[in-house]
Amino acid sequence: MAETVADTRRLITKPQNLNDAYGPPSNFLEIDVSNPQTVGVGRGRFTTYEIRVKTNLPIFKLKESTVRRRYSDFEWLRSELERESKVVVPPLPGKAFLRQLPFRGDDGIFDDNFIEERKQGLEQFINKVAGHPLAQNERCLHMFLQDEIIDKSYTPSKIRHA
């Protein structure tokens, strides 16, 4: 019984103030996938998504960044992580081959509903991946999230804490 009282006292010795209760979390990583834009014509047509990152994790060089990525960039990231890290990489939302067939009654992979579903799936994917401590050390993840252009000829390596 005495142990319980001591434990309770230890918990209430420091009163919480408003800054503690409503201040920013000690460590955070927020990634939003938004603002899909379809560009190009014919077979050269594709959709890009805005990737916005806000973080205070010291491993990231930028505390806020915005880049645009297409589905094939997510595929590249996934294959790099599978090849170079010990992280179990979640699946991407499906490729939607049937939506690419000609003579469909809708816009196929450029249909607004499909793009919205894919956007949500890509956001879930990147948040799961980037939230993994081992993945946060991979250079390919940092390039994907924060570099305007992905250097696909990079040398795979780990990021060291700043």
From Swiss-Prot:
Post-translational modification N-acetylalanine, affected residues: 2
UniProt keywords, alphabetically: Acetylation, Chromosomal rearrangement, Cytoplasmic vesicle, Endosome, Isopeptide bond, Lipid-binding, Methylation, Microphthalmia, Phosphoprotein, Protein transport, Transport, Ubl conjugation
Modified residues (Omega-N-methylarginine): 43
Binding site for a 1,2-diacyl-sn-glycero-3-phospho-(1D-myo-inositol-3-phosphate): 70, 72, 95, 118
Annotated consequence of substituting residue 28 to A: Abolishes interaction with retromer cargo-selective subcomplex VPS26A:VPS29:VPS35
SMART domains listed in its UniProt record: PX
Intracellular or extracellular location(s): Early endosome; Cytoplasmic vesicle, Phagosome
Pfam families named in the record: PX
Main location: other
Sequence positions bearing Phosphoserine: 72
PTM per Swiss-Prot/TrEMBL: Ubiquitinated, leading to its proteasomal degradation. Deubiquitinated by USP10.
InterPro entries: PX_dom, PX_dom_sf, PX_SNX3_Vert, Sorting_Nexin
Result after altering residue 156 to A: Decreases VPS35 binding
Outcome (variant: residue 160 to A): Loss of VPS35 binding
Residue span(s) of domain PX: 27-151
Effect of residue 50 to K: Loss of VPS35 binding
Gene Ontology BP terms: endocytic recycling; host-mediated suppression of symbiont invasion; intralumenal vesicle formation; late endosome to Golgi transport; membrane invagination; negative regulation of early endosome to late endosome transport; negative regulation of phagocytosis; negative regulation of protein catabolic process
Single GO molecular function: phosphatidylinositol-5-phosphate binding
Effect of residue 71 to A: Abolishes binding to phosphatidylinositol 3-phosphate
Residue numbers spanned by region Binds predominantly to PtdIns(P5) and weaker to PtdIns(P3) abd PtdIns(P4): 147-162
Reported disease: A chromosomal aberration involving SNX3 has been found in patients with syndromic microphthalmia. Translocation t(6;13)(q21;q12).
Complex formation: Interacts with VPS26A, VPS29 and VPS35; the interaction with VPS35 is direct. The association with the retromer CSC subcomplex subunits is proposed to represent a functional distinct retromer variant described as SNX3-retromer complex. Interacts with USP10 and SCNN1A. Interacts with TRFC. Interacts with SNX8; 2 molecules of SNX8 seems to associate with one molecule of SNX3. Interacts with PTPRU. Interacts with MON2 and DOP1B.
Family affiliation: Belongs to the sorting nexin family.
Domain notes: The PX domain mediates specific binding to phosphatidylinositol 3-phosphate (PtdIns(P3)).
Protein purpose: Phosphoinositide-binding protein required for multivesicular body formation. Specifically binds phosphatidylinositol 3-phosphate (PtdIns(P3)). Can also bind phosphatidylinositol 4-phosphate (PtdIns(P4)), phosphatidylinositol 5-phosphate (PtdIns(P5)) and phosphatidylinositol 3,5-biphosphate (PtdIns(3,5)P2). Plays a role in protein transport between cellular compartments. Together with RAB7A facilitates endosome membrane association of the retromer cargo-selective subcomplex (CSC/VPS).
Record protein name field: Sorting nexin-3
